[in-house]
Amino acid sequence: MNPCLAIIDPNTLSNIALRSVLWDVYNNVEVYTYGDMDSFIRDSNRHFVHFFVNSDILFKHIDEFETLKNQTTVISVGPDKKFSKAGFNVLDISLPEEELMSKLLRIQLVSRYKMEHGNSSRLKSNSELSPGEKDVLR
């Protein structure tokens, strides 16, 4: 069974491009794209090992991903310090191609280790951020 990655972004072109790049960068992964959280949640029976989430969607659904920080990469246009300070990986899609690819290669897909050892994660709703930290993100 190949590791499953999720891209949650309302921009269809961005989804297609990132899926193609992920297939090029990571061998033997399945990549699923979703335009919103509702479609993602309807398909959440899959065991995703990493999530690439649009910054606006993550902002609105921070409670769903805060326990999955190591497995979540925020897709942003430009640097997004509020999410990186909160412990999320941030992928600035406005970077030059070489820098963007380098950043993707550095992202540690927690999933690889877990999938190779029989553990996988599902979306959880447990809370780890304090109310103050949540306010900073909002």
Language model features with spans:
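Helix-turn-helix DNA-binding segment
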Residues: E116-R138
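N-terminal regulatory/sensing modules of transcriptional regulators
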Residues: M1-G118
